[in-house]
């Protein structure tokens, strides 16, 4: 069993988060050479009886899917994290549990993130959709684009909307969930649910008893029952980072946490890299828009967060999307992953130049870094104005917002 | 003297020297006189430095820290050349640049909220600048694309704007530009000194913004050029042009009287002799009874031992203080040049603050500019009257130039030249009029 990738997902709710804004963030840790893309899908009506091709399996499509914007490894169908037009954000975490994850191809955790976003109008509704699909189709399959080994994991999810957050942790088809209405919460690559369970699979406890993991006599503690024997249950660098913030949590706070390598929240190791990040701000006041910031490039400490706002005519951003190989994609053929095509998008390639400069040329690197942070700051300031404004933003003005920011960023990368 | 000329020119300011050159190239017999022993008049560069102190009656003269007096060439009128502007066109057509060297001014800055911001000179500089917020920048970019594409002869480029009727205020409104962006556009790009242009038809403003962009594109960095050894080189260059086409120059020649007969000029008397002419060109100082005062300009020449703060140690720059940043009607300008242009001793900088006078306390009016320049080693304060001619010369055939205004470029000067030319020659000025002819006396014709 290989170690689960050390991703971190965060939520802060008012009043712990500032100004009536729910703040959500995730660092996605994945294999170093993997490219993540940022993709927008508009809302679509679907034919009755139609199917949707997820990463490995095909399932029934619903009549209508919501507009979504997601960050995902370019080879798979689902998402590591993302948001929908209704202000729902979802992130997943790969987890090792006592019970090995199925290698049989089914739905990946990433597929369920996307399906939850496409179908749920609230965090709770998305949770119900995910557990229903889990029950119907199960979870399983390779999490990595690797022909030689199957890396499979159980999945946990952080689901957030303007009002509340839910932590959902799943083992096979069994699951437990906790509702969060205040304070801060982080989930990482360990089970974290303990005795406070607001929802659970109806057979969760009987299953645990039947496996001999729970006697039925003591209080049911989900993480204790389902974690591998050698897991250190109380360890979460992200939760520590979040809790020790003395000021109210803002978007900038969240960004700073995601950039922090000393705490281990930002990963740059031999096997894993934080390959993409997201921060979302969800105003409890519904007349303000939700704003979602994506990097689209590896390592948030060397990337900038760029804003996205849902409106009816969002401009597509080809430069942050990887090339599409259609049915010829080695990820779609069996046996899987016999080749590894170049999945780098234009922004990724431009950013490679910037990363090389930052690493090799101290003076030029520092100047470039400073310029990019200044650009990011201007974006954050503009978004703060939108959130402070009594009127919603002009859709014509924000439809090409993410497109423009990607385009601008690339102009600074030779 | 005691000869007959087509045109007599009095005063060797830039305007007069350019007109002298044009007239000579076009076959007129020209006599050019100046009461001073040097070229330039109001637009001269003062050298050595001791002369500047004397001129401003600072009796102790320059301290030793100023270095060799001969290293200094201090302009009395602070201006830069716009790289795609009319004066550069005149220089190129006349090939006067053959005798001159220019440097690109390193930057232009605009004052906002007590600080100065670089006027961006590249796209990435504009994107990185915090002179505007993100959404303002995006609207502004759309506006600039509109201006760049605008062609007054192609209605398809108009986007619903009427160049002769739509006011500039309405164009700004169409692009939803905020007040800060409007100030920046009108004062740092279109280089208007006041806000009167807002209610005028937009064509002139669009053309001015185009001029700025085209000048900027010429050399990068900034849209301005400056001649080594100072602006005084310019009138001399044009005077040389006039001379090689047969123009006669007399410096250090007092003008005792301008002789009129039946309301028409017939000659000039100097030291007892009379030179006769059909037409006369002069600057306002030669005909005080035929000009009227049109305001005042204050210019404060400051010598510094440091670049101006927040200009990235620029050796040369312009700073524009838009008038409503300091509750005035007219902008305040700062032009800074330095030893790098062979106009000052090593390590020294010359910054000149100027504006149109609006109150009885003009020095107080330029204080926001002087604060940007501190510490100042030495200040020279000049308050000049602005004159314009009373008559257009149609009867008198006396054509008087206007005084130099407070702008930091020569476009108004060139407009004055074109206007005088039209009144003298009876036809619109064409830059082709300045092209060298085959018959120049030194055989320097282009083949």
Curated annotation (Swiss-Prot), chain A:
InterPro entries in UniProt: Peptidase_C69
Q: Where in the cell is it found?
A: Cytoplasm
Q: Which GO terms describe its cellular component?
A: cytoplasm; nuclear membrane; presynapse
- One GO molecular function term? dipeptidase activity
Q: Which biological process, per GO, is one annotated for this protein? A: proteolysis
Where is it chiefly localized? Answer: cytoplasm
The protein's UniProt keywords, in alphabetical order, are: Cytoplasm, Exocytosis
Look up the domain of life of the source.
Eukaryota
Please report a single Pfam family linked to this protein: Peptidase_C69
- PANTHER family from the xrefs? SECERNIN, SECERNIN-1
Homology family = Belongs to the peptidase C69 family. Secernin subfamily.
Q: What function does the entry list?
A: Regulates exocytosis in mast cells. Increases both the extent of secretion and the sensitivity of mast cells to stimulation with calcium.
Misc note: 'Secern' is an archaic English term meaning 'secrete'.
Query: What is the protein named?
Result: Secernin-1
Q: Which gene encodes it?
A: Scrn1
Curated annotation (Swiss-Prot), chain B:
Phosphoprotein as a keyword? yes
Query: SUPFAM superfamilies this protein is in?
Result: FAD/NAD(P)-binding domain
| Single GO biological process annotation from the record | response to calcium ion
What tissue specificity is annotated for this entry? High expression in brain, lower in other tissues.
Sorted UniProt keywords: Cytoplasm, Golgi apparatus, GTPase activation, Phosphoprotein
Gene Ontology cellular-component terms listed: axon; endoplasmic reticulum; Golgi apparatus; midbody; myelin sheath; neuronal cell body; presynaptic cytosol; protein-containing complex
Superkingdom of the source species = Eukaryota
Give this protein's Gene Ontology molecular function annotations.
Answer: GTPase activator activity; Rab GDP-dissociation inhibitor activity; small GTPase binding
Identify residues that carry Phosphoserine.
427
Iron-sulfur in keyword set: no
The record's comment on protein family reads: Belongs to the Rab GDI family.
Q: Any idea what job this protein has? A: Regulates the GDP/GTP exchange reaction of most Rab proteins by inhibiting the dissociation of GDP from them, and the subsequent binding of GTP to them. Promotes the dissociation of GDP-bound Rab proteins from the membrane and inhibits their activation. Promotes the dissociation of RAB1A, RAB3A, RAB5A and RAB10 from membranes.
Complex and partners: Interacts with RHOH. Interacts with the non-phosphorylated forms of RAB1A, RAB3A, RAB5A, RAB5B, RAB5C, RAB8A, RAB8B, RAB12, RAB35, and RAB43. Interacts with RAB10.
- State the protein's name: Rab GDP dissociation inhibitor alpha
Q: Which organism is it from?
A: Mus musculus
Cite the source lineage: Eukaryota, Metazoa, Chordata, Craniata, Vertebrata
Per the record, the gene is Gdi1
């Amino acid at each position: 069993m290989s170690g689960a990738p050390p991703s971190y997902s965060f939520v802060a709710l008012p009043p712990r988060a500032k100004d009536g804004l729910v703040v959500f963030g995730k660092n996605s840790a994945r294999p170093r050479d993997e490219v993540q893309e940022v993709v927008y899908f508009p809302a679509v009506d679907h034919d009755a009886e139609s199917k949707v091709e997820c990463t490995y399996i095909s399932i029934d499509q619903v009549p209508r899917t919501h507009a979504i914007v997601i960050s995902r490894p370019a080879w798979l169908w689902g998402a590591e994290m993302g948001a929908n037009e209704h202000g729902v954000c979802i992130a997943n975490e790969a987890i090792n549990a006592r019970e090995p994850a199925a290698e049989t191809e089914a739905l990946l955790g990433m597929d369920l993130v996307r399906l939850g976003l496409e179908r749920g109008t609230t965090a709770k509704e998305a949770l119900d959709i995910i557990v229903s699909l889990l029950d119907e189709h199960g979870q399983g399959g390779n999490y990595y684009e690797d022909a030689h080994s199957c890396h499979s994991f159980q999945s946990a999810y952080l689901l957030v909307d303007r009002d509340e957050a839910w932590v959902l942790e799943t083992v096979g088809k069994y699951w437990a969930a906790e509702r969060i209405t205040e304070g801060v919460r982080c989930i990482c690559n360990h089970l974290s649910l303990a005795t406070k369970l607001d929802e659970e699979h109806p057979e969760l406890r009987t299953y645990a008893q039947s496996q001999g993991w729970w006697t039925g006599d003591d209080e049911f503690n989900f993480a204790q029952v389902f974690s591998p024997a050698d897991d250190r249950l109380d360890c979460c660098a992200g939760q520590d980072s979040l809790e020790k913030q003395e000021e109210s949590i803002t978007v900038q706070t969240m960004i700073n946490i995601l950039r922090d390598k000393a705490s281990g929240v930002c990963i740059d190791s031999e096997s894993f890299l934080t390959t993409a990040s997201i921060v979302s701000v969800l105003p409890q006041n519904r007349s303000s828009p939700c704003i979602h910031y994506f990097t689209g490039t590896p390592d948030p400490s060397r990337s900038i967060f760029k804003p996205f706002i849902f409106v009816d005519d969002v401009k597509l951003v080809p430069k942050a999307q990887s090339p599409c190989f259609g049915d010829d994609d080695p990820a779609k053929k069996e046996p899987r992953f016999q080749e590894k095509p170049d999945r780098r998008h234009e922004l990724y390639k431009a950013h490679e130049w910037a990363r090389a400069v930052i690493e090799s040329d101290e003076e030029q690197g520092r100047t470039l870094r400073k310029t990019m942070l200044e650009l990011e700051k201007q974006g954050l300031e503009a978004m703060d104005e939108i959130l402070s404004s009594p009127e919603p933003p002009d859709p014509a003005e924000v439809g090409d917002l993410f497109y423009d920011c990607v385009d601008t960023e690339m102009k600074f990368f030779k | 003297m005691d000869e007959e000329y087509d045109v007599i020119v009095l005063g060797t300011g830039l305007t007069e020297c350019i007109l002298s050159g044009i007239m000579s190239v076009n076959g007129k017999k020209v006599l050019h006189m100046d009461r001073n022993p040097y070229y330039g008049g109001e637009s001269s560069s003062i050298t050595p430095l001791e002369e500047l102190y004397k001129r401003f009656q600072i009796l102790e003269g320059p301290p030793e820290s100023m270095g060799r007096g001969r290293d200094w060439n201090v302009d009395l009128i602070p201006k830069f050349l716009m790289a795609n502007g009319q004066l550069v066109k005149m220089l190129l057509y006349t090939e006067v640049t053959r005798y001159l060297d220019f440097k690109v001014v390193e930057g232009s800055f605009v004052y906002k909220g007590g600080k100065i911001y670089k006027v961006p000179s590249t796209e990435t500089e504009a994107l990185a600048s915090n002179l505007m917020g993100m959404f303002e920048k995006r609207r502004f970019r759309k506006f600039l694309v509109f201006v760049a594409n605008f062609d007054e002869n192609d209605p398809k480029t108009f986007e619903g704007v009427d160049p002769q009727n739509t006011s500039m205020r309405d164009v700004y409104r169409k692009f939803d530009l905020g007040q800060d962006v409007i100030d920046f556009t009108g004062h740092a790009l279109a280089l208007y000194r006041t806000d009167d242009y807002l209610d005028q038809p937009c064509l002139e403003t669009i053309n001015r913004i185009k001029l700025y962009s085209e000048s900027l594109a010429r050399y990068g960095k900034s849209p301005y050029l400056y001649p080594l050894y100072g602006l005084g080189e310019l009138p001399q260059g044009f005077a040389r042009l006039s001379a090689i086409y047969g123009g006669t120059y007399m410096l250090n020649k007092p003008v005792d009287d301008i002789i009129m007969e039946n309301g028409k000029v017939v000659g000039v008397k100097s030291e007892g002799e009379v030179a006769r002419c059909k037409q006369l060109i002069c600057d306002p100082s030669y005909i005080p009874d035929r000009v009227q005062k049109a305001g005042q300009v204050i210019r404060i020449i400051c010598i510094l031992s440091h670049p101006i703060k927040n200009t990235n140690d620029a050796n040369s720059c312009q700073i524009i203080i838009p008038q409503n940043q300091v509750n005035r009607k007219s902008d305040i300008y700062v032009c800074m040049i330095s030893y790098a242009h062979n106009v000052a001793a090593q390590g020294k900088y010359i910054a000149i603050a100027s504006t149109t006078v609006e109150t009885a306390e003009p020095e107080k009016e330029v204080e926001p500019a002087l604060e940007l320049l501190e510490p100042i080693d030495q200040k020279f304060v000049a308050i000049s009257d602005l004159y314009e001619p009373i008559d257009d010369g149609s009867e008198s055939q006396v054509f008087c130039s206007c005084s130099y205004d407070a702008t930091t470029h020569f476009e108004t000067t060139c407009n004055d030249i074109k206007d005088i030319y039209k009144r003298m020659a009876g036809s619109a000025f064409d830059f082709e009029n300045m092209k060298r002819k085959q018959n120049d006396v030194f055989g320097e014709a282009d083949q």
